[in-house]
């Protein structure tokens, strides 16, 4: 990201950037950056996109930026419930990103830094209505470099499935490649370059 901002890219990186921009330009993706979008505006726009363009998934980045005004209770719970009902009505997944509260920062130890359902802002609403809740946890971010068994956690990430209405909960261990903003199987040491990427 910093290299793009500063314009300090190698020739192959410029080629890669050009390739990705063209790919994004041609992608069937719609970005709506309306500030303080209400859940009712979201539902109206989602219905139109599904009907006119066959949209298959909606991602909200992020829940706390939505405007809860105009709701019967003006509450986040009603907002999350409306999003959940919209997903069922449109028969598509809606992924809503959410902030964590500061509780995780004040807890100590390896397990203390793992996010929990209660760490979600407006956790009651999300816990009640979400079909699935997942967290991304990178121990290295908290300067935790090994687990209680001595396993190396440098560059590792966990996907914590904290709630799954129709399945099991659990953790998935992945390798996080920050330089590529990519997650991969922990056993995969070789990165297959994307088109336009330099090998290695």
Which residues fall in each region the model found?
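Glycine-rich nucleotide-phosphate-binding loops and adjacent flexible coil segments
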Residues: 1-60, 65-97, 102-113, 186
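C-terminal regions of RecA-like/P-loop NTPase motor modules
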Residues: 12, 22-23, 36-55, 90, ...
């Amino acid at each position: 990201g910093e290299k793009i901002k500063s314009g300090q890219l190698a020739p192959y990186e410029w080629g890669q950037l050009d390739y990705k921009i063209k790919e994004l330009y041609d992608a069937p993706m719609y970005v709506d950056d309306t500030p303080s979008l209400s859940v009712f505006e979201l539902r109206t726009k989602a219905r139109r996109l599904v009907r006119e363009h066959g949209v298959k998934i909606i991602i909200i980045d992020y829940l706390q930026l939505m405007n809860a005004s105009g709701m019967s209770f003006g509450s986040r719970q009603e907002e999350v419930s409306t999003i959940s009902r919209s997903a069922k009505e449109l028969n598509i997944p809606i992924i809503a990103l959410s902030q964590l509260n500061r509780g995780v920062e004040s807890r100590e130890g390896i397990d203390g830094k793992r996010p929990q359902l209660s760490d979600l802002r407006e956790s009651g609403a999300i816990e009640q209505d979400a079909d699935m809740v997942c967290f991304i946890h990178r121990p290295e971010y908290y300067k935790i470099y090994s687990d209680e068994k001595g396993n190396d956690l440098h560059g590792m990430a966990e996907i914590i499935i904290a709630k799954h209405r129709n399945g099991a909960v659990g953790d998935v261990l992945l390798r996080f490649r920050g330089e590529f903003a990519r997650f991969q199987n922990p056993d995969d040491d070789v990165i297959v370059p994307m088109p336009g990427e330099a090998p290695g």
